[in-house]
Amino acid sequence: GKSTITQYFDKIGTYTNADDIVAATGMSNQEAAEFVDHKRYEAIENGEDFTFETVLSSQYKIEILKKAKESGYFIKCVFMLTVDPEVNVARVATRVASGGHDVEKSKIIERYYKAVANIPQLMELCDILHIYDNTITPVRIVRKHKDDISIFPNDLWPEAKIIELIGE
């Protein structure tokens, strides 16, 4: 999932993750989400670098990125997805079987489609954007560096599906 992949990327500035806050403090998910969002806006106000991990299924997270962009930030994003939300449902079930936290199936599916729907906005906001499919093993399907966009079709993601995904 996100946290597994996140460990392989450099974190610039302050790193915030609501799940980590819940685990460390016992805050509710909502309290932790509000806490980390406050930290992100605080970083923007202070011109500090920051990194965060999110499902990106809410417009509110896009608003954070918009605020950062308006404030002159260079935005680099790594977006992980799967070809189908049922893959995510199965992964959460595996996590629960190993003692991890559960998420309702309907919520997983809803978040999947909301997050995917945010990709065209990411294409606009991000200076650098890498989109990886993690259905089997992580495989890059989109690379955006400034105005240069490359797509990498494969068996799960044909060219037309990638073009639809990024809103081109």
Walk through the language-model features, giving the residues of each.
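Conserved substrate/cofactor phosphate-moiety recognition/catalytic segment
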Residues: 4-50
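Short, structured coil segments at secondary-structure junctions
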Residues: 9-11, 71, 125
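Conserved beta-strand scaffold positions in the cores of enzyme catalytic domains, especially
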Residues: 15-17, 75-77, 129-131
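Conserved nucleotide-binding/hydrolysis micro-motifs of P-loop NTPases
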Residues: 20-23, 57, 81-87, 136-138
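Short, flexible loop segments at the rims of nucleotide/cofactor-binding pockets, characterized by
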Residues: 26-30, 53-54, 107-110
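Glycine-rich phosphate-binding loop used to anchor ATP phosphates in small-molecule kinases
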Residues: 31-82, 115
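A glycine- and Lys/Arg-enriched "phosphate-lid" helix/loop adjacent to the NTP-binding pocket
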Residues: 73-121
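NTP-dependent small-molecule kinase module
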Residues: 121-168
